[in-house]
């Protein structure tokens, strides 16, 4: 199944590549900043691990014909949506690096010396990626009812993700958000669009009930966010591709930073990390139980167990 999923993810990537090339060819004027924006969308949508597209294809399973094409379209759509969120998130978080390369706002800022211009181009590039996701889905030629339901899934996910991002911003200015509030923003900004939406889209493509994936997605997403929060607080650049300790330096409220105190001794920090890792492992335990209860093909459940194992490895990296 792993090789088959890789092949299907690559088909989704090729859809994105072709769509973005066509879109760039339709740019009516020659403008360096337009080139910057389109290049940024391509860099983010075509690079990375393509976890979300992979989840679409895992949930769809070994489908063929029209169902396989629908899964390929949905995988491409979610990759473009992910690119949009990443570009905007880097602006919000003032991150100058992503995946080990400069972010779009930092590229433009460094070249022009204009901070605001870099921010403006990045915001516009994120808008381009969002619009590309919706246009690709609308123009894919899928049946109308399938397209309508897919639009509902991705727009509902986008709405909740934006809400979670706004809560995250609020936590940066409001003193001492509770772990419960941070957990809520994490669930909204990560579990919904990174796990629930892809798994629902894959189920939709295969013609299976989409609501069955909600609980699994929440637990996998919770564990994934735990691993990401640990990496953001103590991860090294070589592994994360981002500035080490960025969440601490920027004062972001995460599951790690709300537990940290600058006066911590090394053994205290170790205990904080262990506590947060345990939270992630609890999510994975529940996720595996829920996966076992799903009424899905074995290839789908095996793929989901594989995702849980992958997240577990991310947690072990920090143990």
Language-model-detected regions and their locations in the chain:
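Short glycine/serine- and small hydrophobic-enriched flexible loop segments
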Residues: 57-61, 86, 131-139, 199-204, ...
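C-terminal helix-coil-helix/basic helical segment that borders enzyme active sites and/or dimer interfaces
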Residues: 64-65, 202-210, 234-239, 265-273
